[in-house]
């Protein structure tokens, strides 16, 4: 190293000091002033960790006076460098002495950092390259948005999400039967729309009682942080914005809030991309008098591009209300109820033809004639011959059936806007077995109920029923010691005996009220020392997570989880199969919701439902009405809401003792239940169900996601990423790791990691059984954050490594260049599907030959070892003259790769979108539910994407200089 006063150097170990100036040379020591910070440093000249800063022709540099220049020529005089070129502001020829360079310097380009001695460790270079590859892999995945959520891989749910989530501004009705996961389907669609940029602002409208359930589901399953808006929140948000809805991107609110004129006006002005309405079957409509709730949703549906309506099965509440919901999605298409009925008659033939195809048997002449007439513009004779052939491979026959079914579906009046799965069409459900346990009414309750009746009071009929169904509540009103009821209640004795005789079983206990749940936990703990935990609405989300985790724990966990009605909303415990209903809710929907905590797809055992009840009370009467009238314990009851509405008055009269017509009520209920069930079964649309569960396509999506879950390379890459960043990883067993921030992290903060740490797993089954453990996939925010931190900074952009190989001459150099092919386009343009930021690797030998096709990255990387920054800087300086022509050669090779990439991307785009456009244009002639705006969107999209692809640029992202060593 030779030094001269006025030269500019940078510290290899303290690059944050900026550009230093040599101010003194004395003996073997040199002193530098770093003007940006005002600090001095003294170094021994022989081993100073310093790198000389000299720019090259073509670079743009700044002077200390604030003006910039483009370097044309570099000259040296008496050890100082002089830059000749043109000013960027005036265009004048000028000269700048290096002493007058701007002090606050940041080397952003990899070449600048390399020459300035800002050289990273070898593992950081590797993590950066892998991070770019992972981002590319994610962006090009056809299943983007489906892998990340903590949900079971259920084919029909994934199919609906895949089919709807990739549409522009989807407007659909999700009408699966209860227990089939409509909320999960909606969450998957929301997640997919957000990840792909098709949506950014989402409004979810739910009944008051479901706001918290949705908040928990969206956070725990989909890592989506929604905000619940009520009147108080709107008032509070007014300080930040005139329109409170603009203060958050993801909002959950109730219909009650939006009934207020001012709040509705604000919601209408809030530029939502997607609206989700849960329990949409409660939106009442008639042509003459639509309800206020319907009008609210209708007004929003007119201005929000994407709309998802979640509803009970379509005809559960009548055909007219089904039409009303379709009208919300597409008022131009569904404009008149009578016209809708007339059209339905027309495609009844389509459904019959689909039934014939789906049956799997030979087609009758009548069915063939029907298909030929329906598909008259196509030649279906070859497909018919394949279906009817005697000795044909079953796969070929099925392919022919599927082809015709798809053609029929495309002509189905509501095939694109309605998805409905029934338990009859979806496999994987357990049986339900009901066990009732009757006990005599304790004297204490008899006395309390007698006194309560004498005191009377102006209570509503429903309030009296609520008391009659929970006699412990009446007793508590007259008892100073509120908790003493459990000392004599025979249901508590039975529960204790049941738990003792089923010690190896996990048992979920549900009661109506939080007070009852807390009292039961105390009874189990104090009387028998049974390990139980509670779950109620007074607990925070984190407290509920801990309680759920304690219950899920196989060893040392709670045997029983005791939930209140509201506290259990949104939580499912499929790992348990024993359910105890300590009391009964009055509403059959709530009863189904309770049983649905265990009776879900993914439950591996038959669900055992136990009901301890008090004889000759309202409890016993309600149990008989549910069991014998609605079959509500052992079967799902999709018509329960309708039947409860029809028989509510008579039922309440029986339960309060005002009527003794229980037998007549049961007979009438049973007859009406059978009629409703038969009508619903007859109304099943096999073609619609075939489309809704996706068949072989759904199975293929599920298999792909299952394979992705088993990707050990991804797991290794993510763990390596966290290692390099400096995150502490503590293996806790049971497939779980605890992640914690550390003082030596590369970055000051890591969003998503708090002081207590986060427990994570790469195993989907573990995550599904434990609400407190996050499922790590490529889509999880904790992985995305790491990728963003690495690729968004200059971490790993430069590296110097040694290759120990005696077959090559010592000192031989290789230059590994990682380019990014990228273009700027709005996320909503979907450009990433065809050309996301794509790493292009070029490996050059000293003669400029590209070896990247012959030497793959991983095998090359394993042979390399790192060197410390000071030695690396010396090696770079010694190799500079050889590097300049290699960089030019590397750009040439990368340019050739870029041309191929853009050509392939354009061909893929035109092929995929062109085929979809042709298909939809052809279908529009036979199915009016194809919206013109969808076609126009596709045409515009193709034009825009072509322009974006033409602007694709190469950017050098990272450099690795490799030298052969024999030591």
UniProtKB/Swiss-Prot annotation:
Residues 491-639 form the Helicase C-terminal domain. Transcription regulator that activates transcription by stimulating RNA polymerase (RNAP) recycling in case of stress conditions such as supercoiled DNA or high salt concentrations. Probably acts by releasing the RNAP, when it is trapped or immobilized on tightly supercoiled DNA. Does not activate transcription on linear DNA. Probably not involved in DNA repair. Interacts with the RNAP. Has a higher affinity for the core RNAP than for the holoenzyme. Its ATPase activity is stimulated by binding to RNAP. Pfam families: Helicase_C, RapA_C, SNF2-rel_dom, Tudor_1_RapA, Tudor_RapA. The keyword Secreted does not apply. Keywords: Activator, ATP-binding, DNA-binding, Helicase, Hydrolase, Nucleotide-binding, Transcription, Transcription regulation. Its EC number is 3.6.4.-. GO terms for molecular function: ATP binding; DNA binding; helicase activity; hydrolase activity, acting on acid anhydrides. This is RNA polymerase-associated protein RapA. The keyword Transcription regulation applies. InterPro entries: Helicase_ATP-bd, Helicase_C-like, Helicase_RapA, P-loop_NTPase, RapA_C, SNF2-like_sf, SNF2/RAD54-like_C, SNF2_N. HAMAP family: Helicase_RapA. ATP binds at residues 176-183.
């Amino acid at each position: 190293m030779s030094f001269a006063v006025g030269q500019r150097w940078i510290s290899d170990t303290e690059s944050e000091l900026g550009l230093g100036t040599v101010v003194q040379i004395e003996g073997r020591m040199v002193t530098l002033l770093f003007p940006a910070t005002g600090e001095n440093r003294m170094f021994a000249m022989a081993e100073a960790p310093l790198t000389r800063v000299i720019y090259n022709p073509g670079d743009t540099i700044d002077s200390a006076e604030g003006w910039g220049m483009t370097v044309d020529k570099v000259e040296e005089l008496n050890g100082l460098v002089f830059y000749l070129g043109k000013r960027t502001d005036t265009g004048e020829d000028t000269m700048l002495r290096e002493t007058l360079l701007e002090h606050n310097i940041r080397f952003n380009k990899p070449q600048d950092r390399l020459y300035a001695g800002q050289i990273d460790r070898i593992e950081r270079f590797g993590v950066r390259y892998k991070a770019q590859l992972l981002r590319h892999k994610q962006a090009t995945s056809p299943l983007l948005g489906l892998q990340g959520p903590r949900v079971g891989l259920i084919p029909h749910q994934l199919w609906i999400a895949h089919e709807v989530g990739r549409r522009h501004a989807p407007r659909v009705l999700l009408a699966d039967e209860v227990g089939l996961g409509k909320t999960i389907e909606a969450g998957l669609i929301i997640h997919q729309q957000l990840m792909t940029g098709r949506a950014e602002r989402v409004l979810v409208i739910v009944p008051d009682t479901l706001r918290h359930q949705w908040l928990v589901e969206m956070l725990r399953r989909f890592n989506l942080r929604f905000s619940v808006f009520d009147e108080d929140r709107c008032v509070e948000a007014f300080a930040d914005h005139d329109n409170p809805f603009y203060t958050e991107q993801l909002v959950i609110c109730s219909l009650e809030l939006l009934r207020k004129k001012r709040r509705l006006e604000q919601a209408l002005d809030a530029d939502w991309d997607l609206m989700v309405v849960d329990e949409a079957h409660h939106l009442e409509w008639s042509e003459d008098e639509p309800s206020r709730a319907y009008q609210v949703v209708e007004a929003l549906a007119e201005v929000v591009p994407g709309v998802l309506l979640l509803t009970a099965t379509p005809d559960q509440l009548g055909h007219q209300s089904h039409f009303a919901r379709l009208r919300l999605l597409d008022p131009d298409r569904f404009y008149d109820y009578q016209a809708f009925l007339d059209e339905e008659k027309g495609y009844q033939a389509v459904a019959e033809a689909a039934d014939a195809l789906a049956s799997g048997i030979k087609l009758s002449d009548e069915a063939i004639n029907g298909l030929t007439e329906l598909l008259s513009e196509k030649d279906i004779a070859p497909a018919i011959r394949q279906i009817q052939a005697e000795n044909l491979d079953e796969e070929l026959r099925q392919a022919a059936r599927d082809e015709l079914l798809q053609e029929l579906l495309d002509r189905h009046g509501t095939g694109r806007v309605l998805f409905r799965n029934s338990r009859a069409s979806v496999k994987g459900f357990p049986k339900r077995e009901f066990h009732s346990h009757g006990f005599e009414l304790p004297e204490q309750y008899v006395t309390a109920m007698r006194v309560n009746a004498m005191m009377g009071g102006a209570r509503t009929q429903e309030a009296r029923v609520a008391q009659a169904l929970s006699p412990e509540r009446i007793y508590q009103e007259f008892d100073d010691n509120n908790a003493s009821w459990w000392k004599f209640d025979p249901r508590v004795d039975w529960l204790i005996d049941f738990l003792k005789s089923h010690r190896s079983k996990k048992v979920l206990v549900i009661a109506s009220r939080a007070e009852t749940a807390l009292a039961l936990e105390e009874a189990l703990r104090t009387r028998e020392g049974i390990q139980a935990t509670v779950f109620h609405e007074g607990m925070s989300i984190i407290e509920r997570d801990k309680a759920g985790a304690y219950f899920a724990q196989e060893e040392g966990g709670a045997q029983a989880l005791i939930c209140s009605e509201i506290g259990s909303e949104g939580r499912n415990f499929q790992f348990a199969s024993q359910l105890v209903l300590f009391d009964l809710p009055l509403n059959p929907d709530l009863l189904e919701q309770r049983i649905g905590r265990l009776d879900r797809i993914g439950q591996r055992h038959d669900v055992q439902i136990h009901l301890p009840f008090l004889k000759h009370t309202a409890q016993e009467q309600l149990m008989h009405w549910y069991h014998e009238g609605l079959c509500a314990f052992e079967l799902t009851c999709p018509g329960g809401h309708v039947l409860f509405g029809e028989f509510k008055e008579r039922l309440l009269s029986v339960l309060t003792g005002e009527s003794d017509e229980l037998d007549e009520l049961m007979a009438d209920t049973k007859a009406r239940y059978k009629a409703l069930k038969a009508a619903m079964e007859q109304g099943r649309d096999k073609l619609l169900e075939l489309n809704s569960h996706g068949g072989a396509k759904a199975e293929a999506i599920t298999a792909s996601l299952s394979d992705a879950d088993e990707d050990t390379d991804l797991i290794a890459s993510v763990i390596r990423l966290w290692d390099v960043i400096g995150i502490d990883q503590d293996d806790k067993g049971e497939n779980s790791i605890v992640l914690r921030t550390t003082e030596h992290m590369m970055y000051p903060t890591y969003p998503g990691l708090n002081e207590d740490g986060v427990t994570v797993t790469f195993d989907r089954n573990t995550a599904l059984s434990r609400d407190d453990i996050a499922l790590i996939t490529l889509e999880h925010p904790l992985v995305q954050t790491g990728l963003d931190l690495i690729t968004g900074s200059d971490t790993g952009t430069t590296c110097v490594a040694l290759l120990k190989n005696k077959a090559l001459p010592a000192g031989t150099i290789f230059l590994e260049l990682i380019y990014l092919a990228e273009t700027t386009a709005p996320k909503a343009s979907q450009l990433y599907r065809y050309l996301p930021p794509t790493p292009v690797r070029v490996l050059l030998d000293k003669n400029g030959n590209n070896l990247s096709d012959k030497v793959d990255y991983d095998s090359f990387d394993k042979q390399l070892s790192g060197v410390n920054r000071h030695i690396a800087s010396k090696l770079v300086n010694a190799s500079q003259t050889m590097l300049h022509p290699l960089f030019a050669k590397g750009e040439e090779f990368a340019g050739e790769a870029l041309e191929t990439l853009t050509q392939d991307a354009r061909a893929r785009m035109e092929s995929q979108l062109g085929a979809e456009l042709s298909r939809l244009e052809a279908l529009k002639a036979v199915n009016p539910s194809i919206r013109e705006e969808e076609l126009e969107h596709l045409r515009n999209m193709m034009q825009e994407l072509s322009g974006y692809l033409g602007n694709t640029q190469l950017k050098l992202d990272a450099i690795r200089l490799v030298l052969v060593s024999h030591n």
